[in-house]
Amino acid sequence: MGTDRAAIERPTVDQGALGDCWYLAALMSVQRTDPELLAENISGLGDPPGSEGWEVRLYVDGEWTDVAVDPSDLGAQGTVDASSGEPSWASIYEMAMINAHDGRPSAVSADTPAAGIEMITGERASEYDTVAQPSFEEYKQAIDEGRPVTVMTDPLKPIGPAADDLVAAHVYEVSGYDEATGEIILTNPHGPQSQNPYEVRIDPDHPGYAFSITMTGIGEP
Protein backbone atom coordinates (compact mmCIF):
# COMPACT_ATOMS: atom_id res chain seq x y z
CA MET A 1 0.00 0.00 0.00
CA GLY A 2 1.15 3.53 -0.68
CA THR A 3 2.66 5.65 2.07
CA ASP A 4 3.88 8.67 0.12
CA ARG A 5 2.20 12.06 0.35
CA ALA A 6 -0.13 11.41 -2.60
CA ALA A 7 -1.29 8.11 -1.08
CA ILE A 8 -1.79 9.70 2.32
CA GLU A 9 -3.90 12.57 0.99
CA ARG A 10 -6.46 10.30 -0.71
CA PRO A 11 -8.01 7.67 1.62
CA THR A 12 -10.92 8.35 3.97
CA VAL A 13 -10.57 6.89 7.46
CA ASP A 14 -13.10 4.30 8.65
CA GLN A 15 -12.54 3.63 12.34
CA GLY A 16 -13.45 -0.04 12.57
CA ALA A 17 -14.15 -1.73 15.89
CA LEU A 18 -11.40 -0.24 18.07
CA GLY A 19 -12.12 2.63 20.45
CA ASP A 20 -9.28 4.91 19.37
CA CYS A 21 -11.23 7.82 17.89
CA TRP A 22 -9.01 10.28 19.81
CA TYR A 23 -6.05 9.10 17.73
CA LEU A 24 -7.81 8.62 14.38
CA ALA A 25 -9.44 12.06 14.55
CA ALA A 26 -5.96 13.50 15.09
CA LEU A 27 -4.64 11.49 12.14
CA MET A 28 -7.43 12.87 9.97
CA SER A 29 -6.64 16.39 11.09
CA VAL A 30 -2.92 16.06 10.33
CA GLN A 31 -3.81 14.37 7.02
CA ARG A 32 -5.55 17.63 6.15
CA THR A 33 -3.00 20.07 7.58
CA ASP A 34 0.37 18.36 7.06
CA PRO A 35 0.27 15.16 4.96
CA GLU A 36 3.99 15.57 4.26
CA LEU A 37 4.76 15.01 7.96
CA LEU A 38 2.80 11.75 7.93
CA ALA A 39 4.67 10.61 4.82
CA GLU A 40 8.07 11.51 6.30
CA ASN A 41 7.38 9.60 9.52
CA ILE A 42 6.53 6.25 7.94
CA SER A 43 9.21 4.08 6.30
CA GLY A 44 8.59 0.86 4.39
CA LEU A 45 10.96 -2.03 5.12
CA GLY A 46 12.14 -4.62 2.61
CA ASP A 47 12.06 -4.71 -1.17
CA PRO A 48 9.58 -3.55 -2.27
CA PRO A 49 9.11 -1.12 0.66
CA GLY A 50 6.51 -2.46 3.07
CA SER A 51 6.99 -6.11 2.16
CA GLU A 52 8.70 -6.64 5.52
CA GLY A 53 6.67 -4.09 7.45
CA TRP A 54 7.11 -0.45 8.37
CA GLU A 55 8.65 1.85 10.95
CA VAL A 56 6.56 4.76 12.17
CA ARG A 57 7.92 7.71 14.15
CA LEU A 58 5.61 8.67 17.01
CA TYR A 59 6.15 11.05 19.90
CA VAL A 60 5.81 8.82 22.96
CA ASP A 61 6.59 9.77 26.57
CA GLY A 62 8.35 12.97 25.57
CA GLU A 63 10.55 11.67 22.77
CA TRP A 64 10.41 10.53 19.16
CA THR A 65 10.30 6.75 18.93
CA ASP A 66 10.51 4.45 15.90
CA VAL A 67 7.76 1.85 16.25
CA ALA A 68 7.83 -1.33 14.15
CA VAL A 69 4.68 -2.62 12.45
CA ASP A 70 4.57 -6.07 10.85
CA PRO A 71 2.18 -6.74 7.94
CA SER A 72 0.57 -9.46 10.05
CA ASP A 73 -0.28 -6.84 12.69
CA LEU A 74 -2.94 -5.27 10.46
CA GLY A 75 -5.97 -7.11 11.81
CA ALA A 76 -9.59 -7.14 10.76
CA GLN A 77 -10.86 -4.91 13.59
CA GLY A 78 -8.80 -1.80 12.92
CA THR A 79 -9.22 1.21 10.68
CA VAL A 80 -9.47 0.77 6.92
CA ASP A 81 -9.84 2.92 3.82
CA ALA A 82 -13.56 3.72 3.70
CA SER A 83 -13.61 3.44 -0.10
CA SER A 84 -12.02 0.01 -0.49
CA GLY A 85 -12.42 -1.58 2.92
CA GLU A 86 -8.72 -2.45 2.81
CA PRO A 87 -5.92 -1.42 5.20
CA SER A 88 -4.29 1.91 4.40
CA TRP A 89 -1.49 4.12 5.69
CA ALA A 90 -3.81 5.00 8.60
CA SER A 91 -3.97 1.30 9.53
CA ILE A 92 -0.17 1.30 9.83
CA TYR A 93 -0.20 4.43 11.98
CA GLU A 94 -2.94 2.96 14.14
CA MET A 95 -1.03 -0.26 14.71
CA ALA A 96 2.13 1.69 15.51
CA MET A 97 0.23 3.55 18.21
CA ILE A 98 -1.06 0.25 19.61
CA ASN A 99 2.42 -1.32 19.52
CA ALA A 100 3.76 1.72 21.36
CA HIS A 101 1.30 0.82 24.13
CA ASP A 102 2.43 -2.81 24.58
CA GLY A 103 0.41 -4.05 21.61
CA ARG A 104 -2.87 -4.09 23.54
CA PRO A 105 -5.83 -2.41 21.79
CA SER A 106 -7.61 -2.20 25.16
CA ALA A 107 -4.86 0.10 26.44
CA VAL A 108 -5.63 2.80 23.87
CA SER A 109 -9.42 2.91 23.94
CA ALA A 110 -9.71 6.36 25.52
CA ASP A 111 -7.63 9.52 25.63
CA THR A 112 -7.95 13.25 25.08
CA PRO A 113 -8.06 15.24 21.82
CA ALA A 114 -4.67 16.82 22.54
CA ALA A 115 -3.00 13.46 23.21
CA GLY A 116 -3.50 12.21 19.68
CA ILE A 117 -2.28 15.43 18.10
CA GLU A 118 0.85 15.49 20.26
CA MET A 119 1.72 11.85 19.56
CA ILE A 120 1.54 12.40 15.80
CA THR A 121 3.09 15.87 15.47
CA GLY A 122 5.54 15.91 18.37
CA GLU A 123 4.32 19.41 19.22
CA ARG A 124 2.46 20.48 22.32
CA ALA A 125 -1.28 20.87 21.76
CA SER A 126 -3.48 23.30 23.67
CA GLU A 127 -6.44 21.70 25.42
CA TYR A 128 -9.69 23.45 26.31
CA ASP A 129 -12.42 22.02 28.52
CA THR A 130 -16.02 22.96 29.26
CA VAL A 131 -14.99 26.00 31.30
CA ALA A 132 -13.32 27.82 28.40
CA GLN A 133 -14.02 26.39 24.96
CA PRO A 134 -12.81 28.30 21.86
CA SER A 135 -15.16 30.71 20.13
CA PHE A 136 -16.08 30.41 16.46
CA GLU A 137 -13.44 33.01 15.62
CA GLU A 138 -10.78 31.07 17.53
CA TYR A 139 -11.65 27.82 15.75
CA LYS A 140 -11.63 29.69 12.43
CA GLN A 141 -8.23 31.20 13.15
CA ALA A 142 -6.78 27.80 14.09
CA ILE A 143 -8.06 26.23 10.87
CA ASP A 144 -6.85 29.16 8.75
CA GLU A 145 -3.40 28.82 10.33
CA GLY A 146 -3.24 25.15 9.37
CA ARG A 147 -3.46 23.82 12.91
CA PRO A 148 -4.86 20.31 13.57
CA VAL A 149 -8.05 20.59 15.64
CA THR A 150 -10.18 17.89 17.27
CA VAL A 151 -13.07 17.92 19.75
CA MET A 152 -14.58 15.42 22.19
CA THR A 153 -18.28 15.05 22.89
CA ASP A 154 -19.96 14.67 26.26
CA PRO A 155 -19.03 11.26 27.73
CA LEU A 156 -22.60 10.38 28.68
CA LYS A 157 -24.97 12.11 26.26
CA PRO A 158 -24.65 15.35 24.30
CA ILE A 159 -27.66 17.53 25.16
CA GLY A 160 -26.59 20.84 23.61
CA PRO A 161 -26.68 21.93 19.95
CA ALA A 162 -26.48 19.15 17.30
CA ALA A 163 -27.05 16.61 20.08
CA ASP A 164 -29.06 14.25 17.88
CA ASP A 165 -26.22 14.01 15.34
CA LEU A 166 -23.34 13.51 17.77
CA VAL A 167 -21.97 10.26 19.19
CA ALA A 168 -21.34 10.35 22.95
CA ALA A 169 -17.77 9.98 24.25
CA HIS A 170 -16.40 10.40 20.73
CA VAL A 171 -13.64 12.53 19.20
CA TYR A 172 -14.19 14.30 15.87
CA GLU A 173 -11.88 16.16 13.52
CA VAL A 174 -12.73 19.84 13.10
CA SER A 175 -12.42 19.89 9.32
CA GLY A 176 -13.75 23.33 8.44
CA TYR A 177 -16.16 26.14 9.19
CA ASP A 178 -19.07 28.04 7.67
CA GLU A 179 -18.58 31.76 8.18
CA ALA A 180 -22.12 32.50 6.99
CA THR A 181 -23.71 30.44 9.77
CA GLY A 182 -21.01 30.67 12.45
CA GLU A 183 -20.73 26.89 12.57
CA ILE A 184 -17.69 24.63 12.65
CA ILE A 185 -17.76 21.38 10.68
CA LEU A 186 -16.94 18.12 12.47
CA THR A 187 -15.93 14.96 10.59
CA ASN A 188 -16.58 11.57 12.17
CA PRO A 189 -13.77 8.94 12.21
CA HIS A 190 -16.49 6.27 11.92
CA GLY A 191 -16.44 7.06 8.20
CA PRO A 192 -19.07 7.90 5.58
CA GLN A 193 -20.64 4.43 5.70
CA SER A 194 -21.45 4.68 9.40
CA GLN A 195 -25.04 4.84 10.65
CA ASN A 196 -24.00 8.04 12.43
CA PRO A 197 -23.68 11.32 10.48
CA TYR A 198 -20.29 11.69 8.82
CA GLU A 199 -20.32 15.48 9.04
CA VAL A 200 -21.91 17.50 11.82
CA ARG A 201 -22.27 21.28 11.98
CA ILE A 202 -22.33 23.00 15.35
CA ASP A 203 -22.25 26.57 16.62
CA PRO A 204 -19.46 26.94 19.22
CA ASP A 205 -20.90 30.27 20.36
CA HIS A 206 -24.24 28.67 21.27
CA PRO A 207 -24.87 28.95 25.05
CA GLY A 208 -25.30 25.17 25.26
CA TYR A 209 -22.16 24.25 23.29
CA ALA A 210 -20.39 22.85 26.36
CA PHE A 211 -23.27 20.42 26.87
CA SER A 212 -22.38 18.78 23.55
CA ILE A 213 -18.62 19.37 23.24
CA THR A 214 -16.61 18.98 26.43
CA MET A 215 -13.02 19.25 25.21
CA THR A 216 -11.01 20.69 22.31
CA GLY A 217 -7.43 20.04 21.24
CA ILE A 218 -5.56 22.50 18.99
CA GLY A 219 -2.08 21.72 17.70
CA GLU A 220 0.71 23.85 16.28
CA PRO A 221 0.71 24.93 12.61
Task: Locate predicted features.
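Intrinsically disordered, low-complexity segments enriched in polar/charged residues with Gly/Pro
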Residues: 2, 43-44, 161-164
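Predominantly the structural core of cysteine protease catalytic domains
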Residues: 7-34, 52-177, 185-221
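Non-catalytic, low-structured ubiquitin/UBL-interacting segments
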Residues: 1-7
